[in-house]
A protein has these predicted regions:
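Short, compositionally biased P/S/T/A/G/V-rich stretches that sit at domain boundaries
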Residues: 152-187, 194
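Predominantly extracellular beta-rich ligand-binding scaffolds that present long acidic/polar faces
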Residues: 1-132
């Protein structure tokens, strides 16, 4: 998603339970809040635009997100030499990289890890990418070891609005319709629906 700020300004936009691939970019004087979302390559053009990331899984270089805040996030940056910009704040975040990603952040609540497999249940190996099949669920051990500022697990399943893959609107997951109706005009239909309560 790209927003260049042109003649209008994106202010106080909220992205909740979203999966955004490629890039989420803000132009000048723009702001966005991302909650329990998976975002690839967030980018703000300068210090007049900012993001707020809460319980997100972020993939790519966060050094291009200026004047932004990160809380309870999991960050995966596959490039060495990247780090969070000094104009940002970060609390209780994990970065999956070998370098000191949080070197510009003064608090000591953030951690750098090198082992993806000890963090995610379904991690397939190699660099973390935004695959549709990836659930970003933490292992049972990681759920108790890596806690956010609110005491819940870091990442998209923690916080006040934990991600739930169950759709809020009913969705048909199975539908079998008989090829023919019976002699009295009845048609056999078998439907299964998945929805939140």
């Amino acid at each position: 998603m790209y927003y260049d700020g042109g003649s209008s300004v994106l202010k106080d936009a909220s992205f909740i339970h979203c999966r955004i691939a490629e890039e989420l970019r803000l132009g000048e004087n723009c702001s966005a809040s991302c909650v329990n979302s998976v975002i690839q390559a967030p980018y703000s053009t300068n210090s007049t635009s900012n993001f707020e990331f809460i319980n997100c899984c972020l993939i790519g270089d966060m050094g291009r997100a200026y004047s932004s805040s990160f809380k309870n996030c999991i960050i995966s940056d596959n490039e060495n030499g990247h780090y969070i910009n000094s104009s940002c704040t970060a609390y209780n975040c994990i970065c999956l990289t070998a370098n000191n990603y949080f070197r510009n952040i003064t608090n000591a609540t953030n951690k750098s890890l090198t082992e993806y497999a000890t963090l995610f249940k379904t991690y397939p190996g190699g660099p973390l990418t935004l695959l549709d099949s990836e659930t970003f669920q933490l292992t049972d051990a990681a759920k108790t070891q890596y806690l956010g500022t609110d005491g819940t697990e870091v990442g998209i399943y923690g916080g006040n609005l934990p991600f739930d893959p169950t759709p809020s609107n009913p969705q048909i997951t199975k539908c079998n319709v008989a090829a023919k109706s019976t002699a009295d005009g009845k048609l056999s239909v078998d439907i299964e629906v998945n929805a939140a309560e």
